[in-house]
Regions:
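Alpha-helix N-cap/N′ positions at the starts of helices
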Residues: 16-19, 45, 60
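DNA major-groove recognition helix of helix-turn-helix
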Residues: 42, 53-54, 64, 83
């Protein structure tokens, strides 16, 4: 398993964040929320932070994961697990993927 772990390239990181951003956008839209609405619920100073995340730039701060999960009507554990899969793919693999014989 460890042999399969590799450092992600900047391009891979960008693609992962963009995929995650599309997922976040779909969750927000499913709730019928605008970016401004979500920013207000989360007490963010700038709604443009939502736009940045949805476009693959930036990360949700770890100390805000549970707030985001609740705002998007998601189970916090599942939400964080998905974030981890895209923000920290090597850590995700170590924690959650089955060892290969």
């Amino acid at each position: 398993m460890l042999a399969e772990l590799h450092k992600t390239t900047p391009e891979e990181t960008r693609e992962q964040r963009l995929t995650l951003g599309l997922w976040l956008r779909s969750l927000r839209e499913h709730q019928g929320l605008s970016q401004r609405d979500l920013a207000e619920i989360l007490s963010l100073d700038y709604y443009t932070f939502i736009s940045q995340l949805e476009n693959g730039r930036g990360k949700i701060p770890a100390h805000r994961y549970v707030e985001w999960a609740h705002a998007l009507d998601q189970d916090p554990k599942s939400f964080v697990r998905t974030l981890l899969q895209y923000y920290e793919p090597m850590t995700y693999k170590v924690l959650f993927e089955e060892e290969q014989s």
